[in-house]
Amino acid sequence: MYAEETNNVTAIKDIRAREILDSRGNPTIEADVILADGTIGRAAAPSGASTGSREALELRDGDKSRYMGKGVKKAVANVNSQIRSALMDKNVTAQQAIDDAMIALDGTDNKDNLGANAILAVSLAVAKAAAKSQSLPLHQYIADLRNQTSLTMPVPMMNIINGGEHADNTVDIQEFMIEPVGFSSFSEALRAGTEIFHSLKSVLKSQGLNTAVGDEGGFAPNLRSNEEAITVIMQAIEQVGYTAGKDIHLALDCAATEFYKDGKYILAGEGNKSFDSQGFSDYLVGLARQYPIISIEDGLDESDWDGWKYLTEQIGDKVQLVGDDLFVTNPAILQEGIDKHIANAILIKFNQIGTLSETLDAIYLAKKNGYATIISHRSGETEDSTIADLAVGTAAGQIKTGSLCRSDRVAKYNQLLRIEQQVRASYRGREEFIGLRG
């Protein structure tokens, strides 16, 4: 329920938004929610490079004279006027009601009017202010929203080679990741991933390859094939004494929508090699059989549901098949995938849907139906580390927040280290993939 009395210490007394810069040097929106007792909750909206067509709308100004059209003054104005007026004197602890009020105020299916970035920044700032007002860490406040009693530390998906839309190189597959599953704590898993990251740098240098990094902090060398990215990572794992397939598994984010043209999957970096839907599925199946790949994200185009069905039938019992562009954190679309037995996991991105409450709806719908959940950053990030708290507070099981460099990525890992020390939540490692036989 909303609080009626304006002197309630948890009443919202002001909301302020501003333009800030994200990790790619593009504007994004940051919002402050200020309570009657002076408590401030602050949050920023991230931004993606490869985006699903059914994501909620990120409102940009389109004014080419400012930030090349990417300014967010309209979104800022929407927060400082319409959203502020609608939420003044409301009880900040009424997360669902506040999110519902913003959704109703917008009045569109994909938040066209106010912008998902405007709504999300306020939604997350509300949660942070509410947590502070109750003297709760954010992860615990999020857990309490859905009566999540057991907290776990997530297995990190560490993006150590960038390609596709995240780098200016010859690699088509967007992300090559490692998942340190064979460890007893998050801190030890993070250490292993960091050691492999530095080992990979030395492997690349020894082969005369570029060690500059992409949007998410992974290395972005020009390679002869996508498979070569896997082989250099395997060398890096071995070089520091870990066992691939036991201590460390591999994961891919193909972002296949980005190279799907006219019904064909075209690998430009491999001489425009072309596959039909079944052919590219078989290509991925072959990689998963040859290498210790535990997870494949967006292996097919978001509209290629027949291809997804085929891929799920081929390896869905052995490999985690993650829908990102496929599901866009939308409970209705996820339900369709569940009904059709498409994929077996969902990537969770706040800004694809636009509120914390809707994000939680997607997470718990997935959990209820046996789908794995991976909390994710975007390629355009800020120092905001809310996703770390979300991963723990929902016991999501996995988190995807980039490589082991760039402070916008490391901020999330560091927050997880703080949480682990504070709550001593368990790190389940390989048990997070217990449904897979591979």
Swiss-Prot record:
Its EC number is 4.2.1.11. Component of the RNA degradosome, a multiprotein complex involved in RNA processing and mRNA degradation. Its cofactor is Mg(2+). The lineage of its organism: Bacteria, Pseudomonadati, Pseudomonadota, Gammaproteobacteria, Moraxellales. SUPFAM superfamilies: Enolase C-terminal domain-like (SSF51604), Enolase N-terminal domain-like (SSF54826). InterPro entries: Enolase, Enolase-like_C_sf, Enolase-like_N, Enolase_C, Enolase_CS, Enolase_N. PROSITE patterns: ENOLASE. (2R)-2-phosphoglycerate binds at residues 174, 349, 378-379, 400. GO terms for cellular component: cell surface; extracellular region; phosphopyruvate hydratase complex. Binds a second Mg(2+) ion via substrate during catalysis. Catalyzes the reversible conversion of 2-phosphoglycerate (2-PG) into phosphoenolpyruvate (PEP). It is essential for the degradation of carbohydrates via glycolysis. Mg(2+) binds at residues 253, 297, 324. One of its GO terms (molecular function) is magnesium ion binding. This is Enolase. Keywords: Cytoplasm, Glycolysis, Lyase, Magnesium, Metal-binding, Secreted. Its main location: cytoplasm. Pathway: Carbohydrate degradation; glycolysis; pyruvate from D-glyceraldehyde 3-phosphate: step 4/5. The active site is at residues 216, 349. It catalyses: (2R)-2-phosphoglycerate = phosphoenolpyruvate + H2O. Coiled coil: none annotated. SMART domains: Enolase_C, Enolase_N. The gene is eno.
